[in-house]
C-alpha cells in the first residue's frame, strides 16, 4: 500500500472553478486538493497526499524529481496542455520510475484533435478522462491501494 501520493496539476488548472465552468465545472483546485488530502486521511492515518500546481513545465519536472527523493510511491497527474506537448514531463516520470495515473476532467477524445495525443498515456498505469472532478477521487483511491 502506497503511503505518499503526489497530486500534480499543470497549466491553467489553478483557474478551476471559474475557467469554462460548462466544461470543467465549478469545483476549485483548492477544493480538489483538500478532498484528496482528506481522502488519504480517511483511508489510512499513515497515508498522505502531497499537492502541487504549476503553469511552468520546468517546475513540474523539478517537482517530479523531488518526489523521488521524498519517497513518493505514486503520482496522480493532470498535466493539462502539457499532456499533448511535454516530452520533458514524460521523461521525468520515466526517469524517476514512479508509477502514475493520468487524469483529465473532460473527455479529451471528444475535444479538438490536438488533444487526442498524449505523451503520457502509453506509460501510465491508467488514464481517467471525462469523469469530471470525480476522476481525481478515483485516481487517488487507486493510488492509495497500489
Swiss-Prot record:
Q: Which Gene3D superfamilies match?
A: Dehydroquinase, class II (3.40.50.9100)
Record GO terms (molecular function): 3-dehydroquinate dehydratase activity
Offer one example of a GO biological process linked to this entry.
3,4-dihydroxybenzoate biosynthetic process
List positions binding substrate.
Answer: 78, 84, 91, 105-106, 115
- Which controlled-vocabulary keywords does the entry list? Lyase, Quinate metabolism
Q: What class of enzyme is it?
A: lyase
Reactions catalysed, semicolon-separated, are:
3-dehydroquinate = 3-dehydroshikimate + H2O
Cite the annotated pathway.
Aromatic compound metabolism; 3,4-dihydroxybenzoate biosynthesis; 3,4-dihydroxybenzoate from 3-dehydroquinate: step 1/2
Q: Which Pfam families match?
A: DHquinase_II
Record EC number: 4.2.1.10
Hey, where's the site called Transition state stabilizer on this chain? Answer: 19
Residues forming the catalytic site: 24, 104
PROSITE patterns xref list:
DEHYDROQUINASE_II
Q: What NCBIfam families does the record tag this protein with?
A: aroQ, PRK05395.1-1, PRK05395.1-2, PRK05395.1-3, PRK05395.1-4
User: Which family does the record claim for this protein?
Assistant: Belongs to the type-II 3-dehydroquinase family.
Give the quaternary structure. Homododecamer. Adopts a ring-like structure, composed of an arrangement of two hexameric rings stacked on top of one another.
Q: Which HAMAP family match?
A: AroQ
Described function: Is involved in the catabolism of quinate. Allows the utilization of quinate as carbon source via the beta-ketoadipate pathway.
Name of the protein in its database record: Catabolic 3-dehydroquinase
Species this protein is from: Candida albicans (strain SC5314 / ATCC MYA-2876)
Amino acid at each position: 500500500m502506497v503511503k505518499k501520493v503526489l497530486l500534480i496539476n499543470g497549466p491553467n488548472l489553478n483557474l478551476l472553478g471559474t475557467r469554462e465552468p460548462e466544461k470543467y465545472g465549478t469545483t476549485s483546485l483548492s477544493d480538489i486538493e483538500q478532498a484528496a488530502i482528506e481522502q488519504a486521511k480517511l483511508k489510512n492515518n499513515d497515508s498522505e497526499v502531497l499537492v502541487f500546481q504549476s503553469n511552468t513545465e520546468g517546475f513540474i519536472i523539478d517537482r517530479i524529481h523531488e518526489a523521488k527523493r521524498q519517497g513518493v510511491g505514486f503520482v496522480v497527474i493532470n498535466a493539462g496542455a502539457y499532456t499533448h506537448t511535454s516530452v520533458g514531463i514524460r521523461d521525468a516520470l520515466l526517469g524517476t520510475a514512479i508509477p502514475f495515473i493520468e487524469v483529465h476532467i473532460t473527455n479529451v477524445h471528444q475535444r479538438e484533435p490536438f488533444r487526442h495525443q498524449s505523451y503520457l498515456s502509453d506509460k501510465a498505469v491508467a488514464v481517467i478522462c471525462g469523469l469530471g472532478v470525480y476522476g481525481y477521487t478515483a485516481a487517488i483511491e487507486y493510488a492509495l491501494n497500489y
